């Protein structure tokens, strides 16, 4: 006698379709394509969790560079002078200051230039 799976198969398929809820077209309806789409989405999620860190670092660097150039110094020179003068501040905080607290950022730039000279 042939065993078709019954409730077990239905539950397993429903679980995959629930994960594919909101997907476009047959990816949310068909079991096989839904499963493939969900697995692919997990791959993208894993990859992009790593990529997000790189993207934010790029964003911080470009913001610091723009603010530093307004002060007449390039990003690389500024970071070198900050390291030389033992100012312990990370790029995230520098970028935040460059956007929201320009006067404090200017003070750090002046301090780094003065200490390293």
Swiss-Prot record:
Q: What is this protein called?
A: Large ribosomal subunit protein bL20
Q: Which UniProt keywords apply?
A: Ribonucleoprotein, Ribosomal protein, RNA-binding, rRNA-binding
Single Gene Ontology MF annotation: rRNA binding
**One of the Pfam families matching this protein, by short name:** Ribosomal_L20
Quote the function comment for this protein. Binds directly to 23S ribosomal RNA and is necessary for the in vitro assembly process of the 50S ribosomal subunit. It is not involved in the protein synthesizing functions of that subunit.
Whether RNA-binding counts among this entry's keywords is yes
As for family, the record states: Belongs to the bacterial ribosomal protein bL20 family.
Q: Which biological process annotations from GO are given for this protein?
A: ribosomal large subunit assembly; translation
Q: Which InterPro entries match?
A: Ribosomal_bL20, RIBOSOMAL_L20_CS, Ribosomal_protein_bL20_C
SUPFAM superfamilies, sorted: Ribosomal protein L20
NCBIfam families, A to Z: rplT_bact
Gene3D superfamilies of this UniProt entry?
6.10.160.10, Ribosomal protein L20
Q: Which GO terms describe its cellular component?
A: ribonucleoprotein complex; ribosome
């Amino acid at each position: 006698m042939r065993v078709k799976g019954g409730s077990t198969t239905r539950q397993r398929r429903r679980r995959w379709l629930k994960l594919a809820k909101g997907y476009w077209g047959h990816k949310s309806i068909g079991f096989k394509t839904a499963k493939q789409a969900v697995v692919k989405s997990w791959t993208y999620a894993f990859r992009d969790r790593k990529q997000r860190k790189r993207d934010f670092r790029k964003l911080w660097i470009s913001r610091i560079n723009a603010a530093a150039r307004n002060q007449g110094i390039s990003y690389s020179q500024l970071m070198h002078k900050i390291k030389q003068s033992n100012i312990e501040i990370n790029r995230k905080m520098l970028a935040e200051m460059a956007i929201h607290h320009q006067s404090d950022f200017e003070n750090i730039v002046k301090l780094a230039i003065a200490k390293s000279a």
